[in-house]
């Protein structure tokens, strides 16, 4: 436990931001979808990894991925640095750990900036994922 009862996640710093959610995986993802749509972004896919695992006869903790974006924001990034296409569209992973804590995880825009040498003036095109995800777990 962290400060003031905050749940801590003990994972290496690998460019992924993890936010604890007070809701279930399904509820958190539904809230995230609603916020993404309200911001005018396009939802491209919702992948239910745990559901697909169950269809294959395997069991895993609830885990779902939301893929979303806006070509007007992403295309200038890909023109400036084509390798960022491997990390776009934006992705947010909502998952439950072995202690039944729910997490919303996403790539740190600053990490993506360094990884793909994104020009400073284009970082704003992906920086909005932070506030969107924070709102989803609030």
Where are these regions (language model features)?
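Terminal, regulation- and interaction-focused segments at domain boundaries
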Residues: 2-39
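A generic structural signal for well-ordered coil/turn residues at beta-strand boundaries
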Residues: 13-15, 62, 88, 100
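Amphipathic alpha-helical interface surfaces
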Residues: 28, 32, 49, 73-74, ...
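Compact, glycine-rich, soluble single-domain proteins
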Residues: 44-94
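Beta-strand/loop substructures that line and gate deep hydrophobic ligand-binding cavities in soluble
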Residues: 91-119
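Well-ordered alpha/beta subsegment
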Residues: 114-138
């Amino acid at each position: 436990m962290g400060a003031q009862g905050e749940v801590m996640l003990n994972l290496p710093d690998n460019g992924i931001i993890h936010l604890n959610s007070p809701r279930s995986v399904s509820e958190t993802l539904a809230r995230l979808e609603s916020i993404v749509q309200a911001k005018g972004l396009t939802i491209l896919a919702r992948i239910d990894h745990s559901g697909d695992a169950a269809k294959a006869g395997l069991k895993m903790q609830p885990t779902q991925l939301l893929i979303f974006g806006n070509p007007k924001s992403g295309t200038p990034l890909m023109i400036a640095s084509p390798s960022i296409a491997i990390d776009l569209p934006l992705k947010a992973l909502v998952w439950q750990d072995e202690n039944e804590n729910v997490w919303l995880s996403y790539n740190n825009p600053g990490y993506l900036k360094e990884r793909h040498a994104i020009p400073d003036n284009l970082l704003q095109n992906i920086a909005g994922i932070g506030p969107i995800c924070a709102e989803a777990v609030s």
